[in-house]
């Protein structure tokens, strides 16, 4: 397990919980079997499964997959997202959310993933991606690029900051829970909305729509924090 995810694995579900807008957005695009790429502990997949959908999850982190299977009772496999072409099934919806896509470290790898998503989708199937809108960060002429709002509840506080690191962005987190405080860093590949749309088009996707969140807010390149994209294989 990577150091970053190992450090937050025990508190992951305290930090990140599904929300209704997210679930509704996915269910509106669900057509047949669903694949959750980078499913983590499987909370989102479980919500969809509880609503009657046939869902499979994959994640690179074995500890997450164990929780997805044993605690959230979903069909999950420990697998790199670049290996989805090895799955037997095709899908009506593939989604990769939670800024997971940008853990791939190059345009080439992201392009490879999108191509494999296209190949694994049924005709009229949908792909949903959600990452951070990196455009505002890339306009900052400083090593410190900014932060996202702190996640804070009765169980945990999760502080998120971003720093320039060559061609990458260093994602710095501090998680405080009970009697522990853990700081960690991981590099992210800051692909922009324009670059992502271009790759989707090159791989044959159509009906590409960009939003500023799962609430379908209009995407503002300069100000939107999330970037949500849906695309269809016609």
Identify the meaning behind each predicted range.
Residues 193-234:
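C-terminal lobe and adjacent flexible extensions of AdoMet/dcAdoMet transferase-like proteins
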Residues 42-84:
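Class I SAM-dependent methyltransferase SAM/SAH-binding core
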Residues 85-93:
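A short acidic, Gly/Pro-enriched loop at the edge of an enzyme's catalytic core
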Residues 1-32, 43:
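Conserved class I S-adenosyl-L-methionine
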Residues 38:
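Conserved S-adenosyl-L-methionine
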Residues 128-199:
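SAM-dependent methyltransferase
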Residues 111-123:
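A short glycine-rich, Lys/Arg-flanked "PGG" loop and its adjoining helix->strand segment in the class I
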Residues 92-108:
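A short SAM/SAH-binding and catalytic strip from SAM-dependent methyltransferases
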